[in-house]
């Protein structure tokens, strides 16, 4: 009986903590919509204090850093977020977003091999996002893999990304 009671209490506290994190993230999103990135970052940090494995908070903070051009802080945070959330994949789509942001940073540093590796991982976690296939196609093309580029473009088109069709018509005929 005591074990059941402890289990039920644990589940209740977990649900309450998740609801608290979601409210904090929503407040941060509202601040961000008003372009108050400082307040948004503060709220996203607060969400990580409540739940250090909140992939969504890592993604939101990283997005702000990238938009500010602060790639080194974004990369540090993404590495930590991926390391922490990989073992407890609560939200595969959000974790895949962490990989896609990191791939963008690798791309801007012209580290195409790592960019492709991160996009590969993003696709493993979320096979339904056509943008990941499109991004990987562009990186593959820049890296000289035209066949791989065209294959990824076909997948992006199949998933409904119209921009991939234009690029495919230009480079894959």
Summary of predicted features, one role per range:
Residues 2-6, 15-173:
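Alpha-helical tetratricopeptide repeat
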């Amino acid at each position: 009986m005591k074990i059941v009671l402890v289990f039920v209490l644990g589940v209740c506290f977990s649900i309450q903590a998740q609801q608290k994190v979601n409210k904090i993230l929503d407040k941060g999103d509202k601040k961000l919509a008003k372009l108050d990135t400082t307040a948004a970052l503060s709220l996203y940090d607060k969400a990580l204090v409540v739940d250090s494995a909140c992939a969504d908070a890592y993604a939101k903070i990283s997005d702000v850093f990238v938009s500010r051009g602060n790639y080194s802080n974004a990369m540090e945070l993404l590495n930590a977020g991926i390391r922490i959330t990989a073992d407890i994949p609560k939200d595969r789509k959000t974790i895949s977003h962490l990989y896609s942001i990191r791939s963008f940073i690798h791309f801007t540093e012209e580290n195409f091999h790592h960019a492709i590796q991160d996009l590969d991982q993003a696709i493993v976690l979320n096979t339904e996002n056509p943008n990941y296939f499109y991004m990987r196609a562009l990186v593959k093309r820049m890296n000289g893999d035209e066949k791989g580029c065209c294959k990824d473009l076909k997948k992006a088109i199949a998933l409904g990304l119209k921009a991939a069709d234009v690029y495919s018509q230009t480079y894959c005929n």
